[in-house]
């Protein structure tokens, strides 16, 4: 039986890490795409040369033409530019919107049946634009945000309590930015909700609040430490978890930037919510009841995403007709 083809659009730090993880997990054959000649070919060859050591048989190729992604079952998009000092939000939106339009056209032509995972920032606006540009069903196009944000929250909690990360469950909703909503009430250690752990004396509310703030600023913390780049290991692992749930029909419940059409009171926008991912894509949106501060924070997050989407509509009004 032929292996699944997994196309990675963008061969930077995340793209290269994704390719290596696909090989290590033997999820399929990899096509690394990039507009920079030689870069995807070089990275693909480097990773392929590690296969005898790591013991995987996935085939890796690099390409500069969208033709190479033909028939891909999964497409993961990291193409675009990061925000640089002095660059306004609209500058970043304008540049990466053009990239999403080009990528969307390539996917539409060569991989119209794929499950598409977008990682490009600003995430919630870019995944919206990518779905419009590709014309793929909304349930087959998602953004990678919540899995990463929740993983950071889980790691910080496990570190605080000195327990295994495997025993910590945590959910982060909303946009992928500083308005994200880490849900303390729905986060647990071995099934014990965090508020109960505060009562049990495992931690204090003030300490929990600090961890929530650190989660919101998790990406910025790494950027400030690296100084010349941003996170790529954890984002790549997060996208692979989503792809694996689709490819293996695992039906995992994971928070992703999903297209909402009335759920949570949101219409035609991509916002981070828990979903079930199976071989049909997003098979169910899990609608958690939000109240009080959580509801306020979620609404504020949605408003921030709405602002980004409105800016996209002004920059690229032709997307609306798609």
UniProtKB/Swiss-Prot annotation:
Show the catalytic activity.
(S)-malate + NAD(+) = oxaloacetate + NADH + H(+)
Q: Which GO terms describe its biological process?
A: lactate metabolic process; tricarboxylic acid cycle
The record's listing under InterPro entries reads: L-lactate/malate_DH, Lactate/malate_DH_C, Lactate/malate_DH_N, Lactate_DH/Glyco_Ohase_4_C, Malate_DH_type3, NAD(P)-bd_dom_sf
The residue ranges crossing the membrane are none
Annotated NAD(+) binding lies at 10-15, 34, 96, 119-121
The keyword NAD belongs to this UniProt entry's keyword annotation: yes
The EC number(s) attached to this protein equal 1.1.1.37
Active site positions, chain numbering: 176 (proton acceptor)
The answer on whether this UniProt entry bears the keyword Cytoplasm reads no
CDD domains for the chain: LDH-like_MDH (cd01339)
- Residues given in the record as substrate binding sites: 83, 89, 121, 152
Q: Which UniProt keywords apply?
A: NAD, Oxidoreductase, Tricarboxylic acid cycle
Q: Which GO terms describe its molecular function?
A: L-lactate dehydrogenase activity; L-malate dehydrogenase (NAD+) activity
EC top class named in words: oxidoreductase
Please give the family membership noted in the entry. Belongs to the LDH/MDH superfamily. MDH type 3 family.
Tell me the function of this protein: Catalyzes the reversible oxidation of malate to oxaloacetate.
Q: Which PANTHER family match?
A: L-2-HYDROXYCARBOXYLATE DEHYDROGENASE (NAD(P)(+)), L-LACTATE DEHYDROGENASE
Name of the protein: Malate dehydrogenase
Q: Which organism is it from?
A: Rhodopseudomonas palustris (strain TIE-1)
């Amino acid at each position: 039986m032929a292996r699944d083809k997994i196309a990675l659009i963008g061969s930077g730090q995340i793209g290269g890490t994704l390719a290596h993880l696909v090989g290590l997990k033997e999820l399929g054959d990899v096509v690394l795409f990039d507009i920079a000649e030689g870069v995807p070919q070089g990275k693909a060859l480097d990773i392929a040369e590690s296969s005898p050591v790591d013991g995987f048989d996935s085939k890796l190729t690099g390409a500069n033409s969208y033709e190479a992604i033909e028939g891909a079952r999964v497409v993961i998009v990291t193409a675009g530019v990061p925000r640089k000092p002095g660059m306004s939000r609209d500058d970043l939106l304008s540049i990466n919107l053009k990239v999403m339009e080009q990528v969307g056209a390539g996917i539409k032509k060569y991989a119209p049946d794929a499950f598409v995972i977008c990682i490009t920032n600003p995430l919630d606006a870019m995944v919206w634009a990518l779905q419009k540009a590709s014309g793929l069903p909304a349930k087959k196009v998602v953004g990678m945000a919540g899995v990463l944000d929740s993983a950071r929250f889980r790691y910080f909690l496990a570190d605080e309590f000195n327990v295994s990360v495997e025993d910590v469950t945590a959910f982060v909703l909303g946009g992928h930015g500083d308005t994200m909503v880490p849900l303390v009430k729905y986060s647990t250690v071995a099934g014990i909700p965090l508020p109960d752990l505060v009562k049990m004396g495992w931690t204090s509310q003030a300490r929990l609040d600090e961890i929530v703030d650190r989660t919101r600023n998790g990406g910025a913390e790494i950027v400030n430490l690296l100084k010349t780049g941003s996170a790529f290991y954890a984002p790549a692992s997060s996208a692979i978890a989503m792809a694996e749930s689709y490819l293996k029909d695992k039906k995992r419940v994971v928070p992703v930037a999903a297209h909402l059409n009335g759920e949570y009171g949101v219409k035609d926008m991509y916002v981070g919510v828990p979903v079930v991912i199976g071989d049909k894509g997003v098979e169910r949106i899990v609608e958690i009841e939000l109240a009080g501060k959580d509801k306020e924070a979620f609404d504020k997050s949605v408003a921030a995403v709405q602002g980004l989407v409105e800016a996209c509509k002004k920059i690229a009004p032709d997307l609306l007709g798609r």
